[in-house]
Every structure is written in C-alpha cells, then in structure tokens.
C-alpha cells in the first residue's frame, strides 16, 4: 500500500519528470519539489491537491459527448499522470469502467491506429522474433509482476484486429490496478504482432502493425515459445494472463504453459470463474445447489467449454458424479447440440458431448438438435450465451424456457453490447419479470410494470484483479483450477442477493476493493494449501495483501543523483 509520509527518492527532474506518467504529479508538485526538481516555471503557480485535480479532470471528462472521446481523454490522462488517472477512475468506477473497458474498448481496438497518441507496453513483432530479450529490456517498467498478452486475433466479439488488440491488455491492466490494487509500476501490456488476416486493417494506410498475413502453425508456436522463455528469463515470477487468443490457439496455449509458468487465460478461466460465482450466488438465493441445475450453453468455443468444465467441477464438489454432472450440461453451437459421434469436434469439446442415451427420447423436426429443441426437451433452468452472435435468445426461446422454469436464470454474456444474445429488457418483459439476468456488458436497470430490475454485469473484472492480487501476495508459482474455484466461491459469498434475499446478484462496483481482497485471500490460501506458494500464517497473508494493495496517492519526492 502507498505510504504518502515516506519520501520516494528519484533522479528524474525537469521536463523528464513531467513526462514520466508513474511519477508526474502535475500541479500537485509542492513548492519545495518544484525548486528541487527544476520544475519552477514549467507549471502554473497554484499548487493543488489530487482531489482538486480530480474535480477539474472530471469536469473536462463530462464535456465530451461520445464514449470514444471520453476513452481517448482518459487514456491521455493515463499516459500523462497515472496516479491522477486511477484516483479519477476509482472515484467514478461505475461510470468509467464501461469507458476504459467493455464496451467502449471494442471500438477503441477497431480504431487503434487512428486514435493512437503514445506507445504503452510492448509491441513484439514476428519480424523481431530473434530480439525478444532486447525488446523486453526496453520496457518502461522494470519490476514487472503482471503481464497481459494478446495476439489480437479474437478481440471480444470483433475478430482479428491485429495490433489494435493492444487496447485489451491496456484496459485489463487498468482494472488490475483500479479494482485489484496492483501497482501500475508492476504491469506490462503486450501484443504479439504476428500479422493480421483482417483485410480492412491491411488496406488501411493508417494501420501501424506488421502488414503480413497471420503467422500460423509451428512458426506461430515457436514464436510464442520464444516470448514465454524470454519472459521467464527477464521476470521469472511474473503472472502472465493470456487474453483474446483465437479458439484454435487459446486452449492449446493454456494446456502447454499452465504447469510450466504462472499463467491463466481470462477468456476461458476468468469468464468461467465469474460465471460460476454468479450461478452459485443465484442458487444460494433460491435455496438450491448448482448440482441441481440443468444448464444449456449457446456457444461451444473455448470460453463456453471452459465455463462448462468449471460448472461440472463445482457440481462434483457438491456430491454428484462427473458423469451425472456432464449429463446436465448441454452445449449448443452453430451446428446444434454437441453429441457423441459428431465429426470435427475439438479435443476440449469432446468431453462435453451428450450421450445418445440421454437424448434418445427427444423430439425434433431436424437432423440434430437446435437450441429450441434443447430448450424444449432438456428443460434447462440456466441458459448461458457465449456465442458472439446477437439476438439468438429469441422471444420464442425465452418463453419456451419460462414455460417449464418459473425463475429462469439467463446470462447473455457476449461482448460487446452489439453482440449480446438478447437485451435484458426483452428477457424481463418476455418472462414478466421472473428471469434472473446477468450480462457480459453493462446495461441500465430495466423498468417493467412499475418495478426496477438491476442488470448485473457478469464481468471478469470481479475476478481477475483479485486473482492477480492473491498470486502476488502469496508469491504463488502457479494458478491452479482449485485456486480459480475458490475465487468463484469467494465472489458468491459477497452477493447481496444471496446474503439478504434481495438486491443485485453481484456486489456494486463501489465495493470492488473489498471483493478483490476477499478473493485474493481465498486464492492465496488455496495456493498455500496446494504447495504452490510458501506457507505463511493467515495474519501474514492478510498483511501481505494490504501491503501489495496500491492506492492512488502522491508521495513526497526527494532528489537523488542516481
């Protein structure tokens, strides 16, 4: 945690100090600091507090009309004065999270080269594959503890954005700090530029990435391996989060590295953890267990299958067999229900096929079973959308589900907002207010027949900042499935609906710091229990979490020659 009474000794001075975002205070430099660091005359006369700076910055922010302009403005503050940026965001977290991350970050990625102002993080091009160690040594932050890396191929639901995908690691790490208290000095966003197959990007004269079709196969795998080895040489204890890799690479990369380095995939494991946590809270509020639910997924990619496997693991922990748990989970993709004997299924999909014996008495008018067929025959109590295809949870689908389930749980999780499977307002209306709805992107509360229904954002930001904080606080060497499961349970324990029987399914973002600390403690405890972190007392662990929790306050500076 920051201690603003303890001075920080730095050698930067003059314009160089004002140009260093991690150290710049702008108008908050004291008269003594201005004299000591050659800043006199470089700043207006008034010395301000950080709260006075926040008031001005917020006034300027409110002056922008479009979300994109607001995003650009906040990114400019981040690249000028990081402490001010995080104080501003923390003061207005609910309002600004959709601007710095989903859904606005999607448009920012699509327009990355057009709105580019200043470099942040590392752009590691395939053309420089023989110099990755040198590139890592060029990073602005030297004591890196958390890396978010993407290759830009599957950015949200927007597909291949090339280096435009850098907006995602930048946004994710902003939330590691704003929500999880991880110092921005410890973070590094990385994009692996292996080209792009997006014809719009390649044809755009403004595009700033490597103009080449995507590298694939062994060349791609070797490039990622070189990067991972270089990171291990430079920062052997860093946590690496894989972000927005295409389905064909996401799961294989996770399987290849999860037992070698401290890493996880947020799209697969983070999404699974927050979804399981939300479902556990919903079940607790209803007086039931997850193992009693029948769950249908629309979308059987790596994210959907990752959520399904996490749900099955939780069901088994509640006392049912793995076989029984799998029989209660129905995966539907564009070709229909995944069934045994279907051709061309990926390895991670094979474990989630439904046995013919479970569907032999079902009725259908088609070859195979559509989503509507599954809803009608399986009678699910939970419907999860991770398809990236808008509007597929139709009125017919939702009403069919509601016929056999008085309080359906419906999670249209696809991002950004334009890709959501159904609008929350429609789901509430079609079920006469009886559905419990959570979404992947933010939506306003729904007013239906005089009653207001809060729409919870089932967002990974409830989970990954706490995981990162727990890994750092415990000095964990790996991120295990059991650690992720504990994060889900910790999140569920924070649910106002589960605790009080009313209120939102997940806690408000204004309490995200306490949520992240609770998740961090649960994750760290499990890491110690599993032997992937040094053994310490609970008291020492809590102290470590507080010590690692960075706050956006200005420290006093003292001049050093070195």
UniProtKB/Swiss-Prot annotation:
PANTHER family (alphabetical): MALIC ENZYME-RELATED, NAD-DEPENDENT MALIC ENZYME, MITOCHONDRIAL
What is this protein's name? NAD-dependent malic enzyme
Q: Which SMART domains does this chain map to?
A: malic, Malic_M
> Which cellular component appears as one GO term in the record?
cytosol
Listed A to Z, the keywords are: Metal-binding, NAD, Oxidoreductase
Protein origin, superkingdom: Bacteria
Annotated membrane-spanning segments are none
- Coiled-coil-forming residues are none
Output the Gene Ontology terms for molecular function. Answer: malate dehydrogenase (decarboxylating) (NAD+) activity; malic enzyme activity; metal ion binding; NAD binding; oxaloacetate decarboxylase activity
* Assembly description: Homotetramer.
How is the cofactor bound here? Answer: Divalent metal cations. Prefers magnesium or manganese.
InterPro entries associated with the record: Aminoacid_DH-like_N_sf, Malic_enzyme_CS, Malic_N_dom, Malic_N_dom_sf, Malic_NAD-bd, Malic_OxRdtase, NAD(P)-bd_dom_sf, NAD_malic_enz_proteobac
| Residues marked Important for activity (site) | 267
Which SUPFAM superfamilies would you find in this protein's record?
A: Aminoacid dehydrogenase-like, N-terminal domain, NAD(P)-binding Rossmann-fold domains
The UniProt family comment states:
Belongs to the malic enzymes family.
Q: Which cofactor does it need?
A: Mg(2+); Mn(2+)
Q: State a single Pfam family of this protein.
A: malic
């Amino acid at each position: 945690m920051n201690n603003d009474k303890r001075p920080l000794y730095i050698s930067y001075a003059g314009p160089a100090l004002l140009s260093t975002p991690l150290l710049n205070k702008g108008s908050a430099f004291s008269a003594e600091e201005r004299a000591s660091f050659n800043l006199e005359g470089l700043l207006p006369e008034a010395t301000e507090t950080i709260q006075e700076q926040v008031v001005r910055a917020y006034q300027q922010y409110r002056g922008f009309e479009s979300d994109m302009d607001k995003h650009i403005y906040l990114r400019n503050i981040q690249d000028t004065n990081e402490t001010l940026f995080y104080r501003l965001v923390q003061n207005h977290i609910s309002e600004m999270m959709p601007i710095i991350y989903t859904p606005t970050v999607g448009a920012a990625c699509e327009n990355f080269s057009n709105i580019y102002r200043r470099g942040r993080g590392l752009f590691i091009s395939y053309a420089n594959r023989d110099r990755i160690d040198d590139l890592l040594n060029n990073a602005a932050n030297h004591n890196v503890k958390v890396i978010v890396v993407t290759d830009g191929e599957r950015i949200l639901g927007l597909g291949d954005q090339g280096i435009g995908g850098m907006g995602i690691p930048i946004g994710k790490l902003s939330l590691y700090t704003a929500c999880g208290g991880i110092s921005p000095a410890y973070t590094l966003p990385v994009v692996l530029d292996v080209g792009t197959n997006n014809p719009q990007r390649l044809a755009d004269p403004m595009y700033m990435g490597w103009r080449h079709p995507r590298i694939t196969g062994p060349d791609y795998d070797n490039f990622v391996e070189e990067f991972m080895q270089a990171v291990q040489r430079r920062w052997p204890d860093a946590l690496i989060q894989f972000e927005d890799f295409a389905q064909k690479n996401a799961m294989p990369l996770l399987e290849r590295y999860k037992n070698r380095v401290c890493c996880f995939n947020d799209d697969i494991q983070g999404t699974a953890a927050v979804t399981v946590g939300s479902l556990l809270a919903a079940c607790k509020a209803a007086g039931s267990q997850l193992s009693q639910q029948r769950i249908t997924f629309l979308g059987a990619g790596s994210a959907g299958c990752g959520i399904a496997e996490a749900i099955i693991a939780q069901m088994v922990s509640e006392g049912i067999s793995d076989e029984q748990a799998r029989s209660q989970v129905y995966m539907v993709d564009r070709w229909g229900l995944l069934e045994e004997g279907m051709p061309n299924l990926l390895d991670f999909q094979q474990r989630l096929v439904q046995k013919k014996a479970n569907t032999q008495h079902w009725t259908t008018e088609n070859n195979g079973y559509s989503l509507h067929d599954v809803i009608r025959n399986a009678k699910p109590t939970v419907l999860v959308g991770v398809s990236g295809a808008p509007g597929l949870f139709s009125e017919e689908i939702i009403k069919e589900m509601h016929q056999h389930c008085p309080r359906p749980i419906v999670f249209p999780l696809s991002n950004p907002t334009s890709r959501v499977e159904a609008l929350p307002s429609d789901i509430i209306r079609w079920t006469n207010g009886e559905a419990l709805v959570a979404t992947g992107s933010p939506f306003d509360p729904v007013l239906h027949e005089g009653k207001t229904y809060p729409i919870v954002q089932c967002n990974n930001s409830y989970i990954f900042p706490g995981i990162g904080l727990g890994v750092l606080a415990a000095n964990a060497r790996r991120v295990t499935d059991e650690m992720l499961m504990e994060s889900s349970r910790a999140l569920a324990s924070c649910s106002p609906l589960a605790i009080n029987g009313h209120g939102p399914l997940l806690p408000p973002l204004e309490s995200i710091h306490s949520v992240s600390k609770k998740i961090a403690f649960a994750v760290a405890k499990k890491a110690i229990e599993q032997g992937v972190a040094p053994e310490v007392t609970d008291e020492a662990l809590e102290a470590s979490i507080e010590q690692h929790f960075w706050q956006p306050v200005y420290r006093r500076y003292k001049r050093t020659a070195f």
